């Protein structure tokens, strides 16, 4: 049977507390987000939010071409 070094107990307490706090913060962040949530309580439905979630392809390609050609430097 392995012997336990009790001098490492504070280390395990600190690391364990850090893991628990990180997990709790992540859970709180995910559950309070307006678009992505772990529960449906307080979740924003798509019909209630008419704004687009993603940038359309033409806007993206326009930004890319502006950067690629260096037009933003010339203006």
Curated annotation (Swiss-Prot):
Ranges annotated as spanning the membrane: 7-26
Induction notes from the record: By removal of nutrients, in a cAMP-independent manner.
Source superkingdom: Eukaryota
Subcellular location: Membrane
Keywords, in A-Z order: Membrane, Transmembrane, Transmembrane helix
GO cellular component: membrane
Pfam family, one: B12D
Membrane topology annotation: Single-pass membrane protein
Protein name (Swiss-Prot/TrEMBL): Uncharacterized transmembrane protein SSD449
The organism of origin for this protein: Dictyostelium discoideum (Social amoeba)
